[in-house]
Amino acid sequence: MKLAKKAFLLASTMTLVASCGTQSSKEFSSVRLSGAGASFPAKIYTRWFKDLANEGGPKVNYQAVGSGSGRKAFIDETVNFGASDDPMKDKDIAKVTRGLVQIPMVGGTIAFGYNYDCDLKLSQEQAVQVAMGKINNWKELGCPAGKLTWVHRSDGSGTTKAFTNSMEAFSTTWTLGTGKSVKWPSGVGAKGNSGVAGVIQNTPGAIGYVNQSYIKGDVKAAALQNLSGEYVKPTVEAG
């Protein structure tokens, strides 16, 4: 996939919606809906659902439990809708007895977020080596010497799938495979984008992968080298 070879890492989110009937506007405002899934779009979903309620729409409770858990909750019919960073496959769709509509919702960039006193620029090969746990000192990245701690997702995650797809495209030295979860050889695991960002925020010397919207405070975004040799930070414009 050509997009995976750009300097920024891309992810998108699908919403899984059960078939439903029509209701009057008065009934609609009293509806309570529950959803669960990807943490990648959680911030924009929270904003949208707040605006929806303020405009007389239904009250929506969304839990950012990760794509894998959200899909399971939707299949098990414990929520009204789910959110996943990639579409459901036929074998999972067959398990949904109430009907299913998959709607593309949002796209965004995944950043290498880090907490260290350094203007970090990563080549694609360096990015792969960091994620594989091959680099454990900031000096190897042209920064002042210090312990480097890799932070990754511990739950089934569409963000992880998009991230590992890009790592595989970046270099043939990537050997961890791709998917919502992989066997990380080292590092600290955390649930959700917020969990990973929290560990980075509280751990000087930490680096991991997060949705661009979690880049704030002590969590800075690394610039990643593209195929033209330029170092690019993830932004709305770049994505």
Kindly label every feature range from the protein language model.
Residues 1-32:
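Short, low-complexity disordered leader/linker segments with a strong preference
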Residues 20-96, 100-239:
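Exported/periplasmic ABC-transporter solute-binding proteins
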